[in-house]
Amino acid sequence: METVLTARDLTRHYEVSRGLFKGHAQVRALNGVSFELEAGKTLAVVGESGCGKSTLARALTLIEEPTSGSLKIAGQEVKGASKDQRRQLRRDVQMVFQNPYASLNPRQKIGDQLAEPLLINTALSREERREKVQQMMRQVGLRPEHYQRYPHMFSGGQRQRIALARAMMLQPKVLVADEPTSALDVSIQAQVLNLFMDLQQQFRTAYVFISHNLAVVRHVADDVLVMYLGRPAEMGPADKLYENPLHPYTRALLSATPAIHPDPTKPKIRIQGELPNPLHPPEGCAFHKRCPYATERCRSEVPELRLLDQRQVACHHAEQFLG
């Protein structure tokens, strides 16, 4: 199967002022993220706020340049790409944002907003653009006669359908969805998720699905990447990870996810405190101050990602969770 997105040791660091006469500090928002994504597959990226999910999204969509590492889109290395090549790469990777209303122009009719990618990137006539836009509107569950309406005339779920339609107009190879359902009512979330999956099946688009909701992720993901303070904590097939997570942080996230039929035999794992200050990350494992299983080794030695039970995990004591 075709690999459409490859990241190798992707990092993004920011220089932050510490105040007058104190110089600058470095925030490692993204630190050594690697993965491969095939056409028609979904990689879910999960973690708490501040773990680097949105920074990864901005790097993948070329909104920001990574500090180091390699990023390939459809086999094309981003670093060193020419202006024309970058233009094509941006066509190949599109994004759906968390707040659909904020990503739409309130003064422009949605038909014109959906046609804009075609106007910029193709030589289609006005009538051909209109026809393609109305066809896409039908595919996302919107009525073509709403072509002349403005964003404020639609519900939240309809606006997210509009945002998704706009992202799919150029039939990208990769779609990055940053919390696409978190601003929607629960009753609408399932409809939008099913629409994502229908379009993926039709166009064989690869998804990078960013979310903090593991119940939603379970519905859509083929593979899951769990991040903590900019680093991968655990990554592997979704069924394996949900069946038996091997990193204490993943176990805690799943333990906190509401379930219709909870398993009383599984102990509840509660993590204390907040994410550490990224300006002053802890020594050793970044999670050790909140981890109920931490040992002296965790406080002094950074765990490397290693292969264990068909997934990668960054924990010194992951073997104790095998079973």
From Swiss-Prot:
<keyword id="KW-0571">Peptide transport</keyword>
<dbReference type="InterPro" id="IPR003593">
    <property type="entry name" value="AAA+_ATPase"/>
</dbReference>
<keyword id="KW-1003">Cell membrane</keyword>
<feature type="binding site">
    <location>
        <begin position="47"/>
        <end position="54"/>
    </location>
    <ligand>
        <name>ATP</name>
    </ligand>
</feature>
<dbReference type="InterPro" id="IPR017871">
    <property type="entry name" value="ABC_transporter-like_CS"/>
</dbReference>
<keyword id="KW-0472">Membrane</keyword>
<keyword id="KW-0653">Protein transport</keyword>
<dbReference type="Pfam" id="PF00005">
    <property type="entry name" value="ABC_tran"/>
</dbReference>
<comment type="function">
    <text>Part of the ABC transporter DppABCDF involved in the uptake of various di/tripeptides. Is also involved in the uptake of phaseolotoxin, a toxic tripeptide inhibiting the enzyme ornithine carbamoyltransferase. Responsible for energy coupling to the transport system.</text>
</comment>
<dbReference type="GO" id="GO:0005886">
    <property type="term" value="C:plasma membrane"/>
</dbReference>
<dbReference type="GO" id="GO:0015833">
    <property type="term" value="P:peptide transport"/>
</dbReference>
<dbReference type="InterPro" id="IPR003439">
    <property type="entry name" value="ABC_transporter-like_ATP-bd"/>
</dbReference>
<dbReference type="InterPro" id="IPR050319">
    <property type="entry name" value="ABC_transp_ATP-bind"/>
</dbReference>
<dbReference type="GO" id="GO:0015031">
    <property type="term" value="P:protein transport"/>
</dbReference>
<dbReference type="GO" id="GO:0055085">
    <property type="term" value="P:transmembrane transport"/>
</dbReference>
<keyword id="KW-1278">Translocase</keyword>
<keyword id="KW-0997">Cell inner membrane</keyword>
<feature type="domain" description="ABC transporter">
    <location>
        <begin position="5"/>
        <end position="254"/>
    </location>
</feature>
<dbReference type="GO" id="GO:0005524">
    <property type="term" value="F:ATP binding"/>
</dbReference>
<comment type="similarity">
    <text>Belongs to the ABC transporter superfamily.</text>
</comment>
<protein>
    <recommendedName>
        <fullName>Di/tripeptide transport ATP-binding protein DppF</fullName>
        <ecNumber>7.4.2.9</ecNumber>
    </recommendedName>
</protein>
<keyword id="KW-0547">Nucleotide-binding</keyword>
<keyword id="KW-0813">Transport</keyword>
<dbReference type="GO" id="GO:0016887">
    <property type="term" value="F:ATP hydrolysis activity"/>
</dbReference>
<dbReference type="InterPro" id="IPR013563">
    <property type="entry name" value="Oligopep_ABC_C"/>
</dbReference>
<dbReference type="Pfam" id="PF08352">
    <property type="entry name" value="oligo_HPY"/>
</dbReference>
<comment type="subunit">
    <text>The complex is composed of two ATP-binding proteins (DppD and DppF), two transmembrane proteins (DppB and DppC) and a solute-binding protein (DppA1-A5). Five orthologous SBPs (DppA1-A5) are present in P.aeruginosa, which increases the substrate specificity of the DppBCDF transporter.</text>
</comment>
<dbReference type="InterPro" id="IPR027417">
    <property type="entry name" value="P-loop_NTPase"/>
</dbReference>
<keyword id="KW-0067">ATP-binding</keyword>
